[in-house]
Amino acid sequence: MKIFLPVLVMLILCSMCLLTEGQVSTNKKCSNTSQCYKTCEKVVGVAAGKCMNGKCICYP
């Protein structure tokens, strides 16, 4: 039981690192998600992304 907490913390930290590596930030300004599709298709090859804080974020 003593090892459970450290293993759980390590699992959470590793999961956070893997999830943040999966997104590509661009400098393309946007006001809605549909403006990001063409940019994401050029950057990562897939039209999968969204507009966050006025910039396109793409997901490969």
UniProtKB/Swiss-Prot annotation:
Keywords: Disulfide bond, Ion channel impairing toxin, Neurotoxin, Potassium channel impairing toxin, Secreted, Signal, Toxin. Disulfide bonds join 30-51, 36-56, 40-58. Residues 1-22 form the signal peptide. Its main location: secreted. It comes from the Eukaryota. Expressed by the venom gland. It is found in: Secreted. The keyword Secreted applies. GO terms for molecular function: ion channel inhibitor activity; potassium channel regulator activity; toxin activity. Pfam families: Toxin_2 (PF00451). One of its GO terms (cellular component) is extracellular region. SUPFAM superfamilies: Scorpion toxin-like (SSF57095). Blocker of A-type voltage-gated potassium channels of cerebellar granular cells. May also inhibit Kv4/KCND when coexpressed with DPP6 or DPP10. The occlusion of the outer entry of the K(+) conducting pore is partially reversible and affects both open and closed channels. It shares the same target in rat brain than BmTX3 (AC Q8I0L5) and AmmTX3 (AC P60208). Has been shown to weakly inhibit TRPV1 channels. Belongs to the short scorpion toxin superfamily. Potassium channel inhibitor family. Alpha-KTx 15 subfamily. Has the structural arrangement of an alpha-helix connected to a beta-sheet by disulfide bonds (CSalpha/beta). This is Potassium channel toxin alpha-KTx 15.9.
